[in-house]
Amino acid sequence: MNRLQRGSHVLIILIVVAVIGIIGALAWVFVSNMKDSDQSDSTPLSQVDTPPSELIWQQGEVGWQSTSTPPECPAQPIMKSPADISKATGVLYPGQTRGGNYKPHGGFRFDNNKNADITVTAPLDGFIVRGGSYLAEGEVQYTFDIMNNCGIMYRLGHLRVLPDNLQKIADTWPAPTADSRTQSLNPVVYVKAGDTLATSVGITETVNAFFDWGVYDYRQENEASKSIAYQQLHAQDKELSWHAVCWFDWLPSADSSKVKSLPPGDPTSGKNSDYCR
């Protein structure tokens, strides 16, 4: 019986050792996989994305069209906020009438800040395809249209002071007048998300700190443009009005919530919008 007991004990010990070994091996594999996953998830976007060599979107008679297959892009890309919106005191809703004219773009107001307190940065990689300078209340203002190869364009306006690289471009344009129309850039200029586009905004004489921001999706027409009445009202501005979006939900969640909590920046149109519901 003693021999049998000793044999049983040895067998049990061997089984326990084997089980521990198997558990240890499985744990090692699991931890290794977790490390690989963590390393993959934490890879900076700049290391996996390379700037496109050229713009694949061109404007023709029927609007913006891609000249080759666009990259795979989410239906609703998340963009960086173009400014520190913790300073914003109001939001201008896209798709409303302001100052007697229809505005497919929105924007931000910064009533508690000076003009030079607001820095505007690129919310998305893209190519500057158009730009313009014009006079508002006697002060020079700048506008840029920037197109991403996904087919998303954004417009930033009422920029007051530009960084040197963009000022060199603006210096080649005709002298500014009250006409705010833009002109094409040739060649186009690539900018990365986060690049500085302006170091002051709005009208400095009256310390009116604000800027315009519109986002346009050329992969499809917006819901508002499906209305016959809307089509008739905006037949002359299909490029912008038929493709403008409510960019509130195109921001990181915290910024999106902040924007939606802001009071409307236009006292007349308020929160009325053809795009934001």
Which residues fall in each region the model found?
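Surface-exposed, glycine-biased beta-strand/turn segments
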Residues: 44-143, 147-150, 190-193, 243-245, ...
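Short alpha-helix capping/helix-loop boundary micro-motifs
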Residues: 112-115, 180-185
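Short hydrophobic beta/alpha edge segments that flank linear recognition/processing sites
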Residues: 141-146, 187-217
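Ser/Thr/Pro/Gly-rich low-complexity linker/stalk segments immediately outside membranes or between
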Residues: 32-50
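N-terminal Sec-pathway targeting helices
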Residues: 4-20
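Hydrophobic alpha-helical membrane-insertion segments, chiefly the h-region
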Residues: 19-30
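Surface-exposed intrinsically disordered loops and tails
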Residues: 167-183, 226-275
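Zn2+-dependent peptidoglycan hydrolase active-site motif and core
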Residues: 123-183, 209
